[in-house]
């Protein structure tokens, strides 16, 4: 009986233990179910998250592709920009070199312009001086031409007077010869024609007076002839001097005209240089 009781107690204890274990198992099963449900929820959540991540990954990959494409475009743009920057740097360097050369050319052109301006001023002053000298030379040439005309006129007048004096002298000489012939004829007839002595004497005296007058006239004519000859020589000398002066002045005028042509050529060359310098500055 005791054994049965013990066995009953043992069985009861086992039942209690089994019940406890059953309860524990149930609890564990509920806990396991809860954990399973939670795990399923977490799995579903993870699946959703994975799906979301996959979607995000797809979007990210798509975005990455777009970004990579944009990056490639930007890299190409960067390379192009770098090439453009390099080209711009080269162009800037070339422009700086051109600027330096332009500044040098500008300085040279400025110096040439200053020299040309100075040369133009000097040429203008020289031109005015040459014009004044030309005017003065023209006035001197006019005066010398007038003197030459006057000298030629005096020479012509002297020639005319010389011809007239020579003609008159020839007439006087002819009269003297005739008077001498008459005197000789009178003297030869004195012996034969004593009755005509008085008449012949009077004629002789008249002839002597005429001869004396003729001699005086001849002396006067000779003096005048010498004076005219002297004046003629002086006129010829003045004419020769005037001609030499005219030739000298003509040479001086030719030289001045040559200098004026040279100055005009220089002025033209300076003007061409200035035009070229302005064109270079504009370019």
From Swiss-Prot:
Pfam hit, one: Tropomyosin
Keyword Glycosyltransferase: no
Keywords: Coiled coil, Repeat
Keyword set includes Coiled coil: yes
Coiled-coil intervals: 1-283
SUPFAM superfamilies: Tropomyosin
InterPro entries: Tropomyosin (IPR000533)
The protein's assembly and partners: Homodimer.
Family: Belongs to the tropomyosin family.
Domain notes: The molecule is in a coiled coil structure that is formed by 2 polypeptide chains. The sequence exhibits a prominent seven-residues periodicity.
Function: Tropomyosin, in association with the troponin complex, plays a central role in the calcium dependent regulation of muscle contraction.
PANTHER family attached to this UniProt entry: TROPOMYOSIN (PTHR19269)
Name of the protein this chain belongs to: Tropomyosin
Organism: Locusta migratoria
Lineage, broadest ranks: Eukaryota, Metazoa, Ecdysozoa, Arthropoda, Hexapoda
């Amino acid at each position: 009986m005791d054994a049965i009781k013990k066995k009953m107690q043992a069985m009861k204890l086992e039942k209690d233990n089994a019940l406890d274990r059953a309860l524990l198992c149930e609890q564990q099963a509920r806990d396991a179910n809860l954990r399973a449900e939670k795990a399923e929820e977490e799995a579903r959540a993870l699946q959703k998250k994975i799906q979301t991540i996959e979607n995000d990954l797809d979007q990210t990959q798509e975005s990455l592709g777009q970004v990579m494409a944009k990056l490639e475009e930007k890299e190409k743009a960067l390379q192009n920009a770098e090439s453009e920057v390099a080209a711009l740097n080269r162009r800037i360097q070339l422009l700086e070199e051109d600027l330096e050369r332009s500044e040098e050319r500008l300085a040279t052109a400025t110096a040439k312009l200053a020299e040309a301006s100075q040369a133009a001023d000097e040429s203008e002053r020289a031109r005015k001086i040459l014009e004044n000298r030309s005017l003065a030379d023209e006035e001197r040439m006019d005066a010398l031409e007038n003197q030459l005309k006057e000298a030629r006129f005096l020479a012509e007048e002297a020639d005319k007077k010389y011809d007239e004096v020579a003609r008159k002298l020839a007439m006087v000489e002819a009269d003297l010869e005739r008077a001498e012939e008459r005197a000789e004829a009178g003297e030869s007839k004195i012996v034969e024609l004593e009755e005509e002595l008085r008449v012949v004497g009077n004629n002789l005296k008249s002839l002597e007076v005429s001869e004396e007058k003729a001699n005086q006239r001849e002396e006067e004519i000779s003096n005048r002839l010498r004076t005219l000859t002297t004046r003629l020589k002086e006129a010829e000398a003045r004419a020769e001097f005037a001609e030499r002066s005219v030739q000298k002045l003509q040479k001086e005028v030719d030289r001045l005209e040559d200098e004026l042509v040279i100055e005009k050529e220089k002025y033209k060359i300076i003007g061409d240089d200035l035009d070229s310098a302005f064109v270079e500055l504009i370019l």
